[in-house]
């Protein structure tokens, strides 16, 4: 299963739509990890399973989602409610509570992937205001049973090999 994962687009609608259209025929799910700053009914948000970030005012967005992706559970949240700028520990505990092996989150605007205690944490970075690098990024997540490919792309659609990686879940 392939999943498009974006976060922290902060009001961008045209660019978000371009990214979605670029991959819509290749992915089975699209996830927005919050801070879209767009109403849930906005055209650019159509097709996205989205959560509420600290800058989102639309209460139609939930604080988190648990999605079934093949054999794996995926936990999606923005991250501000779990203090992710300081530690992933709170998010790790929540992932264990919902039996998720993969966690997608945003908030920090820092693109990166980390395996901790058998759980894969993925922050796709920001489509608008990246931190720690100049590239505005998103992720295509490819889950095949226990094998996971995490490919980072620039907003222009070019793969970023230095951020991309593969994992095998326990």
Language-model features, listed with the residues they occupy:
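Active-site-proximal beta-strand elements of phosphoester/diester hydrolases
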Residues: 2-8, 73-80, 120-125, 151
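Core catalytic region of metal-dependent phosphoesterases/phosphodiesterases
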Residues: 2-70
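Active-site metal-binding loops of divalent metal-dependent hydrolases
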Residues: 7-10, 34-36, 54-56, 79-81, ...
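Short, well-ordered secondary-structure micro-motifs
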Residues: 16, 42-44, 61-63, 86-87, ...
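Conserved beta-sheet core of the metallophosphoesterase superfamily
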Residues: 49, 84-147
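Helix-adjacent hinge/juxtasegments
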Residues: 51-54, 58-101
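Short glycine/serine/proline-enriched coil/turn segments at secondary-structure junctions
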Residues: 58, 130-132, 159
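Charged phosphate-binding loop/patch that engages nucleotide di/tri-phosphates or the phosphate backbone
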Residues: 144-170
């Amino acid at each position: 299963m392939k999943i498009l994962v974006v976060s922290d687009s902060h009001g961008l609608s045209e660019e978000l739509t371009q990214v979605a259209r670029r991959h819509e025929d290749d992915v089975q799910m699209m996830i927005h990890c919050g801070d879209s700053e767009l109403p849930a009914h906005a055209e650019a948000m159509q097709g996205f399973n989205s959560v509420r970030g600290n800058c989102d005012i639309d209460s139609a967005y939930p604080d988190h989602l648990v999605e079934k992706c093949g054999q794996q559970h995926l936990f999606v949240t923005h991250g501000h409610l779990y203090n992710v700028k300081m530690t992933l520990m709170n998010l790790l505990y929540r992932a264990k509570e919902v039996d998720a092996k993969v966690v997608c989150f945003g908030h920090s605007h820092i693109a990166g992937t980390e395996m901790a205690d058998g759980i894969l944490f993925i922050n796709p970075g920001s489509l608008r205001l990246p931190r720690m690098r100049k590239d505005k990024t998103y992720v295509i997540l490819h889950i095949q049973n226990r094998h996971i490919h995490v490919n980072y792309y620039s907003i222009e659609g070019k793969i970023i090999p230095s951020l991309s990686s593969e994992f095998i879940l326990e």
